[in-house]
């Protein structure tokens, strides 16, 4: 089984980082095409936004490693502050995370 951590961007420029085993299904859930999870992004969809996948990271040995990477990506994004474009903030955090010797520990 493959594990993914993904980055979504909304039509309004918002971003979301999450983890899944099925990228296509998860994006459909975020866009409320099918039921299941995705509560945080569902509000935006109700306001007329749609989500697209900007990218993903794969190659995690197990689900806990993917969740650890997701958590670190989200938290590293915060160090760039709110003045930076949300997508730029997420991409800078991803760059920093991938530069670490052990990004999942």
Question: What are these model-derived regions, one by one?
Answer:
Residues 5-10, 14-22, 26, 30, ...:
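GIY-YIG nuclease signature motif recognition
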Residues 4, 16, 51-55:
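Residue-level detector of short, conserved catalytic/binding motifs and their immediate flanks
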Residues 84-105:
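A cross-kingdom feature marking charged/low-complexity
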Residues 23-67, 72-88:
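Conserved short loop/helix modules at catalytic or binding sites
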């Amino acid at each position: 089984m493959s594990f993914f951590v993904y980055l979504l961007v909304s039509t309004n420029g918002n971003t979301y980082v999450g983890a899944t085993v099925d990228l296509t299904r998860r994006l459909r859930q975020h866009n409320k095409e099918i039921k299941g999870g995705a509560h945080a992004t569902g509000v935006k969809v109700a306001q007329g936004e749609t989500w697209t996948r900007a990218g993903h990271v794969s190659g995690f040995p197990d689900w806990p490693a993917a969740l650890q990477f997701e958590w670190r990506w989200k938290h590293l994004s915060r160090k760039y502050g709110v003045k930076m474009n949300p997508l730029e903030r997420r991409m800078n955090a991803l760059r920093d995370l991938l530069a670490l010797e052990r990004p999942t520990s």
